[in-house]
Amino acid sequence: MIIEGRNIKESKVLLKTKYCVIGSGAGGAVVAERLARDGHEVILIEEGGYFSPGSLRGDTEAIAMAKLYRDAVMQSTDDQSITLFQGQAIGGSTFVNHALCFHMPHELINEWISSGIIKDFTSDDLEKHYSEVERFLQPKVTPDKYMNSSTKLFHKTFQDRNLSTTFTKRNTNGCIGCGSCFRSCDIAAKSSTDLTFIPEAINNGAKVYSDFKAEKIIFKGKTATAVEGTIMSQMKQAKGTFRVDAEYIVVAAGALHSPWLLGRSGIKNKNLGKHLKIHPIVPMQALFKKDMDSFNGVPQAISSFQYTDYKNKKEKGFVYYCDFSGMMGTSTHMPGMGNELRERIGKLRKMGQTQIMLLENTTGEINCKKEKPVITYNLNEMDKNEFVKASKIMGNLYFESGAEAVYLGNQVFTSPDQLNGISTDLFEPFASHKYAAHFQSTCRMGASSKDSVTDNSGKVFDTENVYVADASILPDSVGVNPMLTIMAFASLVAERLSKK
């Protein structure tokens, strides 16, 4: 059973455990399950609420997303030019993501090992942990009958031109292609952590609390003694306080909030909140003569890594994901206002969309001294030029596949020749829609505190018992959707921590 803070009547809750895990997403849930399985006393706390399968079925996209995403889908960079999607519920971002499962490229993990960033484990060790978490997820390729028409067109267009595509494995079981992954799965067909790792942790004795917002780790010298925070109401207002006394604390609040929590708890490390990678995305849309009905089917089932180069340390390229994430979300990416926009929305059935995801050179940072994380991220010229290249290629592919028009940011292109006018100006702040959901490397692991925040076991330098187990410990961008890699690294941290 999950204990919901919104239903707790006491104004102050005091708890005690051996291990306190903060966060229930791809990192925290995996750690809690492993520790509980090994017979340890575990309390897992999550700031977001608990939503049972199907409980959001009657909500509109806007209402459901406001409940499930941090800041009601309004979290962004400090200049508000890049929207930052992050799940805030039991299950974390696994509750609202598209369930894509990738192993990180061998070139990258080998680069980390050869450079000395990782010394205590090998790529074979990591593969063991991928296998461990895949036992729960059972990732598989989406059956053809559940792929939407945009996916099929994307595949044919790329294959006809000898461009590579990948049918992506997804952690689903019983998926029927309803297309609502981004707002949870109404039929519980997505193997998010709330349906996999967390129930197993509870079965093995772990206690799980929703609506518990961790705000400070209490230290005595270098030893953490407790986590303190606020109990949130259903409307995300403060309704009480809590304290969890613990022998070990595992921070898994995500790469935006883990460094913030450590910073406001007194951790002083020059790398804290630095080295932020986000995999920035620009959506490109295409208007066709025929009805596409792209909203019928799995939102993301195919991708292309044709233009990636994982051996290049500066320009690793970009990935195309065929994507159609709901009518509301897709409509917000269209150019125009007023009647012009209304007319375009009226043609939504004829639309296709591709995400252009950059394996960026840019690095951002988080200010951990404010009341909430302040994220600074400004695309450098190299990355803007990569977006230009990627947009021209995809735009031409759309026209070759029969598109009448292509939309990019506030621009409408009606012929291939017009694509030549795409320049870096279109990727300045607010000139095009940009968003991200893959936040990484802000508490990165490494050999020493000179360039890292945690060691290779996930322990925070200069502490005795504080660990991090989420995307923030990844030394750099993993170059693919990071969920499975986050889980593998969390499994590794949990294995070592369980021996304490």
Residue ranges of predicted features:
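Helical element adjacent to the flavin cofactor pocket in flavoenzyme catalytic cores
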Residues: S180-E247
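Rossmann-like flavin
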Residues: I90, T94-C175
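N-terminal FAD cofactor-binding segment of flavoenzymes
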Residues: H40, E47-V96, M104-H106, T151-H155
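FAD cofactor-binding and catalytic pocket of flavoenzymes
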Residues: N97, N269-N396, A436-S441, F461, ...
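Extreme N-terminal leader/targeting segments of oxidoreductases
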Residues: M1-Y19, R37-D38, K499
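N-terminal Rossmann-like FAD-binding beta1-loop-alpha1 element of flavoenzymes
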Residues: K18-L44
